[in-house]
């Protein structure tokens, strides 16, 4: 479970609020880095405990959303076994989220939940009003869906989307189904996906959540800080131009 540099106790959460206020930020979600596909029951239950800790943190911060993952493939487990583990884990934490009045936003992430049919199956089988989707616009493209398929997926997921990660990239064969990872991640205005169209579509379909930037453009970890800030400011201006 990724906790950054602050603890999830009351003092740590108080510090989060202070830091957010000092920068004029609003905490829109707590991010759980869980993986329900585990080699043992003890490890699985540890993941459940970690997500519940994030739900408590969101509740105490007055934040409506916890971003969750499903899980990743594991050697020795079939895809079906992995999906069943994800469904079981999400059922356990969704019931707790319902009690706390927190929404879980399952991200399309990695090699399982980026399959949109599996993602929707998980939502259907968990069958909880507390479980929705965190729409990561770049991850479906990374997974190998063509540009037209990605646009159709966004339309399908809009009614069950509770949070977003705006991400973009370019692909040499953008109109074809590709292998996983055949994408170069770019600043938001420079990718193949028309994110302004996505943002407008979400609003038209009644989405009331935040438009969150998760720009993982190549070089973001090595460029000078001022250059990264410049690119992120351009991302913000780009998304604001949707309205």
Stretches found by the model and what they are:
Residues 223-243:
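C-terminal helical cap(s) of enzyme catalytic domains, especially alpha/beta-barrels
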Residues 212-216:
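Short acidic/histidine-rich active-site segments
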Residues 1, 33-36, 70-74, 110-112, ...:
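Active-site-proximal loop/turn and secondary-structure-junction residues that shape catalytic pockets
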Residues 26, 64, 162, 208-209:
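Short acidic/polar active-site loop segments enriched in Thr and Asp
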Residues 20, 58, 104, 136, ...:
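Conserved, mostly hydrophobic/aromatic
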Residues 30, 88-192, 196-200, 243:
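Acidic/histidine-rich catalytic cores of soluble enzymes
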Residues 2-8, 32-49, 71-83, 176-186, ...:
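Surface-exposed, active-site-proximal loop segments in enzymatic domains
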Residues 13-23, 37-133:
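Active-site acidic/histidine proton-transfer and metal-coordination neighborhood
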């Amino acid at each position: 479970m990724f906790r950054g540099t602050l603890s999830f106790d009351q003092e740590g959460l108080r510090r989060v609020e202070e830091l957010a206020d000092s920068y004029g930020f609003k905490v829109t979600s707590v991010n759980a880095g869980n993986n329900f596909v585990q080699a043992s029951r003890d490890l699985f239950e540890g993941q459940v405990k970690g997500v519940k800790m994030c739900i408590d943190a969101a509740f105490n911060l007055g934040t409506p959303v916890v971003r969750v993952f499903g899980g990743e493939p594991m050697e020795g487990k079939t895809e079906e076994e992995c999906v069943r583990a994800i469904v079981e884990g999400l059922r356990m934490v969704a019931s707790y989220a319902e009690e706390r009045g927190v929404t879980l936003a399952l991200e399309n992430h990695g090699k399982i939940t980026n399959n949109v049919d599996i993602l929707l199956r998980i939502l259907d089988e968990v069958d909880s009003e507390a479980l929705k989707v965190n729409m990561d616009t770049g991850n479906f493209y990374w997974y190998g869906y063509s540009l037209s398929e990605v646009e159709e997926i966004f339309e399908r997921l809009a009614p069950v989307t509770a949070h977003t990660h705006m991400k973009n990239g370019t692909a040499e064969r953008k109109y074809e189904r590709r292998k996983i990872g055949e994408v170069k991640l770019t600043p938001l205005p420079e990718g193949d996906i028309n994110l302004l169209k996505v943002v407008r579509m979400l609003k038209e379909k009644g989405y009331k959540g935040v438009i969150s930037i998760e720009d993982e453009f190549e070089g973001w970890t090595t460029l000078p800080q001022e250059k990264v800030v410049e690119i992120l400011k351009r991302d913000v201006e780009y998304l604001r131009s949707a309205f």
